[in-house]
Swiss-Prot record:
Domain of life of the source: Eukaryota
A Pfam short name: Aldedh
Pathway: Cofactor metabolism; retinol metabolism
Positions of post-translational Phosphoserine modification: 413
Species assigned in the record: Macaca fascicularis
Protein name per its UniProtKB record: Aldehyde dehydrogenase 1A1
UniProt subunit comment: Homotetramer. Interacts with PRMT3; the interaction is direct, inhibits ALDH1A1 aldehyde dehydrogenase activity and is independent of the methyltransferase activity of PRMT3.
One Gene Ontology cellular component annotation held by this UniProt entry: axon
């Protein structure tokens, strides 16, 4: 997930209008049952963009009813050929490609994401992911099993049913596609709750769902708050599975609610405090650049952020020097402004949390190399910050910061750094930089993380499974493994008169 250039960027639209602000159920737009709305803001200017209908339990109930009806045996969705499901997903990808400029602009304006990153990275990723999922629709298959006796046995990989999907604010459109793509490819129906900070692109995609020709009730989108709409999804007795991307704290609540209700299936992609280990024999320029983007991409608002950099003692000072030099190159500003290379944090809550953690680093004895405070008079901007001389017991070395703050630690031996890297509740991802293949394989095997990148960082594609160890979640998204999360395996055994080999 490295920053992109701007050479291929189309000119921003000057007349952007937000068309879709209502709840989407059964391919129709609805006001909230309560009549409530909530404001949506631009984090770069703190200005209100619009008011969106606020869904809660009553609206979730309506959406689940529609999704359940669409999933009934004999429904248009259940009787549709798998290849036709794939065709609908291809069509949706084409429509997103058609509206790519509009969606990227909206993502930047509502989420504080650099326009170049939104257009070149996020939208490109969404389109590729949908097409990948579309191709899988008619390739999800069971097996025949040669059991003992005069029987014919086979397995079916069936859709789970109604899936609740709760989307985070840091990658609103990407995570929406990660959720609905595999679910729909497998034949499920979905009830989606986008993050309250960033619901706009999901609601626009809802209009494209209808335009693509998905039957009513297959996709339903209910904007609202976590403690109301999100909790209603997690605890709903007629939702068969819930998938969530977000904080570990909220992930625990979702898993608890799933267990206390109907034991619905759960997939969680949660927080991280990912280690990045740089050995003395590494290509230093490459390591500095990947480690830098690993933590500063999207203002540090990434679950995979390389937020613990362990550098071998002999190259530590030079690594710090180059990292500080690189961090000082940022131009902060409105992410829609040409030339800006760092945008704002998503909201004041996150902004205050990041600044508090920066202050803790100063007080606990880390050396502030650059940054260390807010920027500007308006918007939630934080200076790119680098700390050296960080030790493992400091808050900035243990807690997920979710901001543009790099911690650089020193190590002497491989055994020591592996123990320190694994000494965390999290286990989402990790990086290793070395030119020694033996060390690369040894360290990669020892690290407790769902993804390990060697001599690179943040390479995430639709073909690869993604997910965490330990308290970074459970289950996998994307890749062939990701489709397993959206099917139930059924064994069917038929008595026959005679079995032949």
């Amino acid at each position: 997930m490295s920053s992109s250039g701007t050479s291929d960027l189309p000119v921003l639209p000057t007349d952007l209008k937000i068309q879709y602000t209502k709840i989407f159920i059964n391919n129709e737009w609805h006001d909230s049952v309560s009549g409530k709305k909530f404001p949506v803001f631009n984090p770069a200017t703190e200005e209100e963009l619009c008011q969106v209908e606020e869904g809660d339990k009553a609206d979730v109930d309506k959406a689940v009813k529609a999704a359940r009806q669409a999933f009934q045996i004999g429904s248009p969705w259940r009787t549709m050929d798998a290849s036709e499901r794939g065709r609908l997903l291809y069509k949706l990808a084409d429509l997103i490609e058609r509206d790519r400029l509009l969606l990227a602009t909206m993502e930047s304006m509502n989420g504080g994401k650099l326009y170049s990153n939104a257009y070149l990275n996020d939208l490109a990723g969404c389109i590729k992911t949908l097409r990948y999922c579309a191709g899988w629709a008619d390739k999800i298959q069971g097996r025949t099993i040669p059991i003992d006796g005069n029987f014919f046995t086979y397995t079916r990989h069936e859709p789970i049913g109604v899936c609740g999907q709760i989307i985070p604010w840091n990658f609103p459109l990407v995570m929406l596609i990660w959720k609905i793509g595999p679910a729909l490819s497998c034949g499920n129906t979905v009830v989606v709750k986008p993050a309250e900070q960033t619901p706009l692109t999901a609601l626009h995609v809802a209009s494209l769902i209808k335009e693509a020709g998905f039957p009513p009730g297959v996709v339903n989108i209910v904007p609202g708050y976590g403690p109301t709409a999100g909790a209603a999804i997690s605890s709903h007795m007629d939702i068969d599975k819930v998938a969530f991307t977000g904080s570990t704290e909220v992930g625990k609540l979702i898993k608890e609610a799933a267990g206390k209700s109907n034991l619905k299936r759960v997939t969680l992609e949660l927080g991280g405090k990912s280690p990045c280990i740089v050995l003395a024999d590494a290509d230093l320029d490459n390591a500095v650049e990947f480690a830098h983007h690993g933590v500063f991409y999207h203002q540090g608002q990434c679950c995979i952020a390389a937020s613990r950099i362990f550098v071998e003692e002999s190259i530590y000072d030079e690594f710090v020097r180059r990292s500080v030099e690189r961090a000082k190159k940022y131009i902060l500003g409105n992410p829609l402004t040409p030339g800006a290379t760092q945008g704002p944090q998503i909201d004041k809550e996150q902004y205050d949390k990041i600044l508090d953690l920066i202050e803790s680093g100063k007080k606990e004895g880390a050396k502030l190399e650059c940054g260390g405070g807010p920027w500007g008079n308006k918007g939630y901007f934080v200076q790119p910050t680098v700390f050296s001389n960080v030790t493992d017991e400091m808050r900035i070395a243990k807690e997920e910061i979710f901001g543009p703050v790099q911690q650089i630690m020193k190590f002497k031996s491989l055994d020591d750094v592996i123990k320190r890297a694994n000494n965390t509740f999290y286990g989402l991802s990790a990086g290793v930089f070395t030119n020694d293949i033996d060390k690369a394989v040894t360290i990669s095997s020892a690290l407790q993380a769902g993804t390990v990148w060697v001599n690179c960082y943040g390479v995430v594609t639709a073909q690869c499974p993604f997910g965490g160890f330990k308290m970074s979640g459970n289950g996998r998204e994307l890749g062939e493994y990701g489709f397993h999360e959206y099917t139930e395996v059924k064994t069917v055994t038929v008595k026959i008169s005679q079995k032949n080999s």
